[in-house]
UniProtKB/Swiss-Prot annotation:
This is Cytidylate kinase. ATP binds at residues 12-20. It holds the Pfam family Cytidylate_kin. One of its GO terms (molecular function) is ATP binding.
Length: 225
């Protein structure tokens, strides 16, 4: 029964460091990992591949309901598999990210993917990375964390990440995109980006990733005792 399987939810905006934190928590505890944002990115990529109108809720719902996606963390790094193909890199572009955010604004699309996300809850436990994990997907999770950082810091991190991969990027453009996405995510009618009640709130703007991991892990272990 999934009701007794513990879940640690980690919510927050893009670029706050959720992915790194969740991988560290999963490794430290030996738990499964769900990158819910990747599911929406996979849906966006699938829509682009199959030429489905990303602004049509009616067209996206059946695609979401039959989305063939799985996560493979056997080799350490989280691999995202869509229809048998490793799309871990392909889903991380800004275009796919912005498309995913638009798709996530549709209530019926979110409902179609909700059951699939909950199916990742298996023993011994699950680390759930997303934007509404603690408020909507796993409201009964015993440990909830909200990780944030300033838009400027997140844009800087994203710029360094993309430059490291050989992309030519502009800081001001990235900052504008992040602020636009933040506004959309925080103000949407369904499942807006807000800290869950009782969540540990961490601001990583001036914290090292090691400090963030240490605080989150200490909180989780204390709560789960």
């Amino acid at each position: 029964m999934t009701a007794i399987v513990p879940v640690i939810t980690v919510d927050g905006p893009s670029g706050a460091g959720k992915g790194t934190l969740c991988k560290a928590l999963a490794q430290a505890l030996g738990w499964h990992l769900l990158d819910s944002g990747a599911i929406y990115r996979v849906l966006a990529l699938a829509a682009l591949h199959h030429q489905v109108n990303i602004d049509s809720e009616e067209a996206l719902v059946p695609l979401a309901a039959h989305l063939d996606v799985r996560f493979d963390a056997a080799e350490g790094d989280l691999r995202v598999i869509l229809e048998g193909e490793d799309v871990s890199t392909a889903i991380r572009t800004e275009t796919v990210g912005n498309t995913a955010s638009r798709a996530a604004a549709f209530p019926r699309v979110r409902e179609a993917l909700l059951r699939r996300q909950r199916a990742f809850r298996e023993a011994p436990g699950l680390i759930a990375d997303g934007r509404d994990m603690g408020t909507v997907v796993f409201p009964d999770a015993p440990v909830k964390i909200f990780l944030d950082a300033s838009a400027e810091e997140r844009a800087h991190r994203r710029m360094l990440q993309l430059q490291g991969k050989g992309f030519d990027v502009n800081f001001e453009s990235l900052l504008a995109e992040i602020k636009e996405r933040d506004f959309r995510d925080r103000n949407r009618a369904v499942a807006p980006l807000v800290p869950a009640v009782g969540a540990l709130q961490l601001d990583s703007t001036s914290l090292s990733i090691e400090q963030v991991i240490a605080q989150a892990l200490a909180h989780a272990r204390q709560t789960l005792v």
